[in-house]
């Protein structure tokens, strides 16, 4: 009799476990937006994503990657692409046709381009024309594509003496090498150097670049992606971008 009772309880326990497991397996996994792009806007978008999650309960993971990694990762599990300038999105789309829904592409918050110089501006650099002077050592970041602002003849490197690949490497080079006199870059990078450098703005529309965004074709979370882009257009997001050196 005791054996039969034990067997019955075992059967009931097994049924409960099966029901619980089945219920758990049908639960909808939490929606997570994966946003990929370069390092420059990464920290700003991460701060926006944190506030967006707090307000709307949608988790957004912002991941920075170099171009060759973006080409691999975004088609795999990316929901949104962001760039540091318009040409970056255009280049990605050219290399990876069909990955982005180009009808969703839009250019958000602008960044001013200017010249980072040493504190006190010892060489009295006030514009592009001064970068042509003999003895001015220029830092160039390849991914920023700033050659047109170096004052040199097209096809020549002019006074560029220091070459790095990313903006983060640019910050490091500026701090480690006091022989660098000027770095043509975005105002947002100068925010990290305010205590040790000056920023000379380059005037005009050609010295302003926007932050492009686009939703991927593969995303299963289209509605959430559109909601995040709408949030990035909000006054709250604008305040975050302004704080980090965007215009």
Please give the residue ranges for each predicted region:
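Residue-level detector of intrinsically disordered/flexible regions characterized by low predicted structural confidence
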Residues: 4, 20-21
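Short loop/edge segments at beta-strand edges and connector loops
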Residues: 64-66
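Exported/periplasmic ABC-transporter solute-binding proteins
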Residues: 22-59, 68-78, 85-86, 91-94, ...
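Bacterial N-terminal signal peptides
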Residues: 9-20
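Bacterial N-terminal signal peptides that target proteins for export
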Residues: 1-11
């Amino acid at each position: 009799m005791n054996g039969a009772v034990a067997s019955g309880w075992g059967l009931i326990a097994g049924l409960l476990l099966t029901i619980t497991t089945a219920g758990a397996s049908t639960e909808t996994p939490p929606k997570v937006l994966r946003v990929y792009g370069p390092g420059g806007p990464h920290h700003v978008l991460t701060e926006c994503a944190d506030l967006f999650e707090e307000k709307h309960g949608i988790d957004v993971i912002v991941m920075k990657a170099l171009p060759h990694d973006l080409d691999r990762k975004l088609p795999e599990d990316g929901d949104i692409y962001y760039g540091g300038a318009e040409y970056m999105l255009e280049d990605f789309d050219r290399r990876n046709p069909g990955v982005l829904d180009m009808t969703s592409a839009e250019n958000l918050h602008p960044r001013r381009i200017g010249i980072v110089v040493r504190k006190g501006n010892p060489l009295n650099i006030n514009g592009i024309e001064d970068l042509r002077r003999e003895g001015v050592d220029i830092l160039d970041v390849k991914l920023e594509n700033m050659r047109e602002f170096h004052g040199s003849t097209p096809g020549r490197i002019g006074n560029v003496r220091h070459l790095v690949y990313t903006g983060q490497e640019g910050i490091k080079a500026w701090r480690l090498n006091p022989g660098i006199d000027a770095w043509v870059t975005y105002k947002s990078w100068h925010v990290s150097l305010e205590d040790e450098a000056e920023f000379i703005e380059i005037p005009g529309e050609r010295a302003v670049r926007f932050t492009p965004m686009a939703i991927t074709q593969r995303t299963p979370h289209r509605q959430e992606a559109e909601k995040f882009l709408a949030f990035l257009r909000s006054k709250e997001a604008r305040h975050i971008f302004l704080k980090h050196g965007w215009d």
